[in-house]
A protein has these predicted regions:
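Short, charged beta-turn/beta-strand-edge "cap" motif at the junction between a beta-strand
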Residues: 43-46
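Surface-exposed molecular-recognition determinants
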Residues: 18-24, 29, 33-40, 51-54, ...
Length: 225
C-alpha cells in the first residue's frame, strides 16, 4: 500500500492509501500554511486548521494551538557602577523570568532588591520575606518595596539565581523564590514573595533598599521563557 503525502493549493485529490493535504490560499503576511488531513477518501472527513510555521520572534515552533518557545537570554550587564540595573523588553507572553547573579557586590550595607515593572518599575505592594543563613546564625525580615536579598556587607559577592513565575495571568500576579550565596562569609540569602501588577510584566530592576549604594562588582543577566 502506498503512503504518499500530497501537497497542493486548490482542489481535491484522492489516491488509494494516501494521506492527502489540501491547502487553500494563505494570508499575504507572515509564514503560514494551512491544510486538511483527509482521514478517508471523502471530502467530508478531514481535520482542518491553520498552522503557523514561524513567528519571527525566536521561537522554535508556534502554532494556533500550542505555543513553543526556547529559553531566551537577555544581555548580561556589569554591576560595577550605578545605583540600579534595569532589564527591559521582556515579552508579554513570558511566564517565567530568572535573574542570575555572578559575583555581585555593592559599596554599602543596604540589602539588594529585585523589583518588577510594567511600563515603569513597581516599588510598592510586595509581600514576602528575606533570610540570611550563616555558619553562626540565621536572621530574617520583610520588605514591601521589592524582593529583598538580605546581604548587608559591602564585601559580599553574591552568586546564584532568583526565579519569578507568573502565578495568575488574570491578575498578573508573580511569585519569586531563590537563593544566592557569598562564599567569602559562608552565608546564603533566601528570598520568597509575591506581587500583583496592573498589566503584563516587561522589566526587571535590581537596586538596593536605600537606593543610594552603588554597584561595585560582578554582573547580572536574565532569562525568560
Amino acid at each position: 500500500m502506498s503512503a504518499d503525502v500530497i501537497l497542493y493549493n486548490q482542489g481535491v485529490q484522492y489516491a488509494d492509501g494516501n494521506i492527502v493535504t489540501h491547502a487553500a490560499t494563505y494570508p499575504a503576511s507572515g509564514s503560514w500554511t494551512t491544510g486538511d488531513i483527509v482521514l478517508e477518501q471523502t471530502s467530508t472527513t478531514r481535520l482542518s486548521g491553520w498552522k503557523r510555521i514561524t513567528t519571527g520572534s525566536g521561537n522554535v515552533l508556534g502554532t494556533d494551538w500550542v505555543y513553543c518557545s526556547n529559553l531566551i537570554s537577555g544581555t548580561a550587564q556589569a554591576t560595577t557602577s550605578g545605583t540600579s540595573i534595569t532589564f527591559t523588553g521582556i515579552p508579554s507572553w513570558a511566564k517565567r523570568v530568572t535573574v542570575n547573579f555572578k559575583g555581585v557586590g555593592t559599596s554599602g550595607t543596604s540589602n539588594k532588591l529585585i523589583q518588577v515593572g510594567n511600563g515603569a518599575v513597581v516599588n510598592t505592594g510586595y509581600l514576602g520575606s528575606q533570610s540570611v543563613i550563616s555558619t553562626a546564625s540565621a536572621a530574617s525580615g520583610n520588605t514591601t518595596t521589592g524582593f529583598a536579598i538580605a546581604s548587608g556587607a559591602a564585601a559580599d559577592r553574591l552568586g546564584g539565581a532568583y526565579v519569578l513565575t507568573l502565578e495568575n495571568a488574570s491578575t498578573n500576579t508573580w511569585v519569586c523564590q531563590g537563593v544566592t550565596s557569598a562564599s567569602n562569609v559562608g552565608s546564603s540569602f533566601v528570598t520568597s514573595g509575591s506581587v500583583s501588577l496592573g498589566s503584563a510584566l516587561d522589566r526587571i530592576n535590581i537596586t538596593t533598599v536605600n537606593g543610594t549604594d552603588t554597584f561595585a562588582a560582578g554582573e547580572i543577566n536574565i532569562m525568560w521563557e
